[in-house]
From Swiss-Prot:
Protein name: Tetraacyldisaccharide 4'-kinase
Superkingdom field: Bacteria
Organism of origin: Vibrio vulnificus (strain YJ016)
Coiled coil: none
GO cellular component annotations of the record: plasma membrane
Protein function: Transfers the gamma-phosphate of ATP to the 4'-position of a tetraacyldisaccharide 1-phosphate intermediate (termed DS-1-P) to form tetraacyldisaccharide 1,4'-bis-phosphate (lipid IVA).
Keywords: ATP-binding, Kinase, Lipid A biosynthesis, Lipid biosynthesis, Lipid metabolism, Nucleotide-binding, Transferase
Family from the record: Belongs to the LpxK family.
Record gene name: lpxK
GO terms under biological process: lipid A biosynthetic process; lipopolysaccharide core region biosynthetic process
Amino acid sequence: MIEKIWFENHPVKYLLWPLLWPLSLLFGAISRRQKAAYQRGAKASFQASIPVIVVGNITAGGNGKTPVVIWLVEKLQQLGFKPGVVSRGYGAKAPVYPMVVDSESLTSHCGDEPKLIFERTGALVAVDPIRPNAVKRLIELGANIIVTDDGLQHYALQRDIEVVVVDGQRRFGNQQLIPLGPLREPTSRLQNVDFIITNGGDAHQGEIAMSLMPDMAVNLMTGEKVAVNELASLVAFAGIGHPPRFFKTLEQLGADVVVSQGFADHQDFDPEAIAKLAHQGKNVIMTEKDAVKCRRFAQNNWWYLPVSAQFSSHDQQRILQRITEVVKEYGSSTA
């Protein structure tokens, strides 16, 4: 219901406005006060000895940050860097922090997005709610550039480049602060970032257009790859920030979807509930982020659809040129 108020101008907003408006004002006041405390030095803000790139957003929910992080990490690896990725591990609880993600890490300990980033890139990934501690650990392990998955509002960590990802279709909704609207910070915050990446929809002036390009469906058990439109009677589910985006992609690919089920972002799946859902079709299709949580109890007819961020060559060059400039300021070199 809350997203209908934020993005769809639902009539119930008139009933909830008197309650949510003062809470939104309070949220804004607290956020401004905390940010100001870091800016004037009243609160400590960690400056790393290597470049830090923050990939975040100014709205609550998923906008496509993780594909951007993966794209950045892969490009940096191609250029000879040893990138380290920082995440707070949303929804997870590690036995110890900072936690360095590896092939044996449970998503309940590290989070689904950190595990996905590790599996896709093989990069160093560290999880800690206190992000500077994760950065320090990654530097100890040999990272020479940091990419943070989310953390735009985590001012305890200084950064050199800020990248904001925007949902190109939903944009900023009613443009109100949480909880009245989806904003973590006012839209004026965008004036101070290095890049605004628009995921789908129409990029506004000065923004970088990104599309998420789907690959072939991958079997969770065997790794076999097939075109998604060759799979019959699909049960599709997604536990991401905006599940309809995934279902729309399947529709555009001509997939034979008989059931679609959305779940909350970062939700832990009950194996029995997912198995019951799966019985409604011949095959199951899910997002790659969901696959890292489902692999331990997957069946032979379960598939996931990987997607990759894609930019124009001009925009790629813009982003990489800015990174090169920052690296030179540090006097760093590739690995």
